[in-house]
Amino acid sequence: MLVRKAVGVLAGVLGLMLPLVAVAAPSASAEPQALVRTLYYDVSQAQEFVADWDRAATNWNNSVSNVKLARRTSTSGVNIRILADNGWPRAYVSSLGNGTVYMGRQAVQQGYHRPRISTHEIGHILGLPDRRTGLCADLMSGSSAPVSCRNELPNAAERAEVERRFAGSLAAVDVRAAGYTGGRTECFVY
């Protein structure tokens, strides 16, 4: 009788544990899902260049996957302030993913391609420095490329660098490691 009762209890316990055994735990080799950081940009002061900044956001969104650009909403913060003036296009980067960019009419009046300018300036916010190669294929060559250049997309190396800078967690990035010095705001001119 005691044995029969013990077997019954054991069978009941095993019956309760069976569903737990059937559920497989994720394997250690499973790829962690990448975290995508969203940066919000504000075009309320972009004047006649709003469409160019939206196009720059689309260019970057179609080129990289670790960071996404979205227009500011009523509930979001602002990472990127966008302004327009009569000077030269430029970016003031306060930290990776944050800063202020200007569409300067001087470059537009000289004939530089507006979507290339806006995509280039956002590149600075995404951690890319100027690289004065003079090549149209290099987005970050900026105004060193010919005025006739219409390439508004980052090349493979530029895309890879942005992916690397935004890979991993959503935690704050050390701006010194991202290429900025002393926590100061850095200015890049097209």
Residue ranges and their predicted role:
Residues V67-Y92, N98-Y102:
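Short, well-ordered secondary-structure micro-motifs within conserved domains or adaptor modules
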Residues P32-Q45, M103, G142-A145:
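Acidic/histidine-rich, surface-exposed loop or edge segments in extracytoplasmic proteins
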Residues L39-A70:
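A short alpha-helix/helix-coil micro-patch that ends at or immediately precedes a cysteine
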Residues L2, V108, H113, P129-Y190:
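Metalloprotease/metallohydrolase-associated module, dominated by Zn2+-dependent proteases
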Residues V50-A57, P115-T119, A137, R159, ...:
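Extracytoplasmic/secreted envelope proteins and their assembly/folding machinery
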Residues W60, R116-D130:
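Active-site recognition of the HExxH zinc-binding catalytic motif
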Residues V101-T119:
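Short pre-active-site segment immediately N-terminal to the catalytic Zn-binding motif
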